Structures are given as C-alpha cells and as structure tokens.
C-alpha cells in the first residue's frame, strides 16, 4: 500500500486539500500501477511560524 506524506503550510482550503489528495493518489496509482483504493495520502499542516526559510519564519517573510 503506497503512502504519501505531504507537509504544507497552513492556510489552504478544504477544497484545495481534497484536490491535492485526489491528484496525488491518481499520480501514484498510475505511476506504480497500484489500485487507487490502496493509495494513502497524509497531509500535515504546519503553522507558518514553524517553517523557516533562509533563517526566518515563513510568517515573517510573508509566505
């Protein structure tokens, strides 16, 4: 059973996350020739202050 774990910054809509799950699942199914029903996707959202880019938080640089 393929499992994809995706870390994203908070702020995406539920619709965007549903689209991400669907499209990642389809890509994995297609590329690995695995049944779509066997694919698992885990989305982990993190606060912008928990992610650093170039020594500053994503929040501090306006991401």
Swiss-Prot record:
Q: Which reaction does it catalyse?
A: (2Z,4E)-2-hydroxyhexa-2,4-dienedioate = (3E)-2-oxohex-3-enedioate
Keywords for this entry?
Answer: Aromatic hydrocarbons catabolism, Isomerase, Plasmid
Top EC category: isomerase
Pathway it acts in? Aromatic compound metabolism; salicylate degradation
Task: Tell me the Gene Ontology biological-process terms attached to this UniProt entry.
Answer: salicylic acid catabolic process
InterPro entries (alphabetical):
4-OT, 4-OT-like_dom, Tautomerase/MIF_sf
Signal sequence interval, chain numbering = none
Q: What is its EC number?
A: 5.3.2.6
Q: Where is the active site?
A: 2 (proton acceptor)
GO MF entry, a single one? isomerase activity
Q: Which Pfam families match?
A: Tautomerase
Q: What does this protein do?
A: Catalyzes the ketonization of 2-hydroxymuconate stereoselectively to yield 2-oxo-3-hexenedioate.
Quaternary structure and partners: Homohexamer.
Q: What family is it from?
A: Belongs to the 4-oxalocrotonate tautomerase family.
- Provide the protein name: 2-hydroxymuconate tautomerase
- Organism listed in the record: Stutzerimonas stutzeri
Lineage here is: Bacteria, Pseudomonadati, Pseudomonadota, Gammaproteobacteria, Pseudomonadales
